[in-house]
Amino acid sequence: MKKPWKCMALALLSGASLFAAESTKPNVLLICVDDLKPAIGCYGDTFAKTPNIDALAKRSVVFERAYCNQAVCAPSRNALMTSLRPQTLGIYDLGTNFRKSRPEAVTVAQHFRASGYKAQSLGKIMHIGHGNGEDAASWDVPHFHAKTIQYSLKENQTPTREGALFDNKRPDQLPRGAATEMADVADDTYSDGQIAAEAIRRLQAAKSDKQPFFLAVGFLKPHLPFVAPKRYWDMHDAAKLPQPERLTPPDGAPSFAPQFGGELRNYADIPDGSKPLSAELTRHLIHGYYAATSYMDAQLGKVLDELKKLNLEKNTIVVLWGDHGWHLGDHGMWCKHTNYEQATRIPILVSAPGAKAARSQALIETVDLYPTLAELAGLPARDGLDGRSFAGVIRESSVKHREFVTHVYPRQNMIGRAVRDERYRLVEWKKPGAESTTAEYELYDYQTDPGETKNLAASQADVVKSLAVRILAMPEAKPQLKTTAAADASKRPVSQHDRTQMFARRDSNKDGNLTKEEFLTGQPDPKDAPARFTRFDQNKDGILSRDEFVQGGADRTKP
């Protein structure tokens, strides 16, 4: 903790650090929260019970317009750790490790280690599961892992499909688990309580350590399942929580752009496919999300209290980051996995010694955190990153950072590349490498339509053209990297449950049948797919019923 800064004079001259008055390197406490949207008190959500995040906000710069780079766990966390966008890595899935694309990448933790920091990680930092794992090269000590899928009640103790996937085991015929749990248990019964306790132990050890620390603490809630001790459920009156106002996708949106909660529908008490959820179930799930968020907030509070108790607060950069947003029934959608506002807007709070608390309207992206932390700590900048430092915004919250942010999401064999500026979002859907003339567009105007109710691409060609120039100026998105593990996975039989989900995605008009056109759209083997359609069509009526699709292909690997 007492090690003098190297190149202090250079840092002072360049204005590269906020810590000009300090004689020691600042510590870094990076708080990562899984599936946390800005449903937080300090972001104006009056229903949220998040006193500890709100207290942190009072000494932080709160970024009102922060966005992830892809609204799903692994690619978003890759962007955080490497400052490389998913389209740069060519990784959009959960199971492909970023080092398959960039084995030489230096993560933000490695960069701090090279500058004399002790780097440690707890909970969920990189995505663990679905064939992916933690990055041992980033940390000085082995990663502290906690279970993502965890229950307390006896009736929920059976091994589940989702639990197996997050444990990197084959789900086979395991049952689906419960989407929620409310048990009258202690906080440390569930993983976030255990993560907080371990974080406190690491802080206590760091107090007497000669090295500055880079401690990444990843809380799991409010990720599904929504499990939390009963008292956190009791903090919220379910009858008063906000309910979705619109239950259908934006008018004019491409049929493939929305999603209706495939992840949520992997749980036992949720209807299959794209069937709408009842008002009662919707209310219960929203209650669960808010309860799980309050539970996480309480665990975070314990860690921040210990930081202050140990007198480390004044020389520690604290960052709170949500990996992506979450649909809570808006537009009939659940979970993340889209390019829409509710899935892509995230909370980012930065508390830095020497910086004043403020609120910023600057547009920032997840990839920007790596170079920002390096600059705040006085570390040298690294070349080859997609992100750019917003330390200047932390010094003066009114300055601009970017004209627009970018994010992506894959659908079928296409990539949806999006640009979001202060007013609009444009999404370009096309195959990687295809001509821009083949693209299908979505355009939303948040000044006149903050609820994203209508795709304006067809009626505002001039706006589409001006924003498309920004997309065309970007490097082309790489297609998904193919690995041996991914190839092996593609050869495994597809379960009936998964084929039911596939059917729901392909049934674009939601009439309960697939036309040949719906079946063939986006098939990975367009030459062979027509014969497969004919084979599945048992009654030869020219359409596929749900049963024909599910039963006809349940033992096959192609959709």
Regions found by a protein language model. Give the residues of each.
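Formylglycine-dependent sulfatase
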Residues: 2, 7-441, 450-470, 493-495
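Amphipathic regulatory helices of Ca2+-sensor modules
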Residues: 515-527, 546-556
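Extracellular/periplasmic ectodomains of large secreted or surface enzymes and adhesion receptors
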Residues: 277-280, 483-495, 506, 516
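Glycine-aliphatic tripeptides that mark coil-to-beta-strand junctions in extracellular
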Residues: 26, 37, 448, 508-516, ...
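Intrinsically disordered, low-complexity Ser/Thr-rich linker and spacer segments
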Residues: 488-496, 525-528, 553-559
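Short, flexible loop/turn segments with low-complexity composition
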Residues: 247, 386-387, 479-489
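Primarily EF-hand calcium-binding motifs
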Residues: 496-510, 529-540
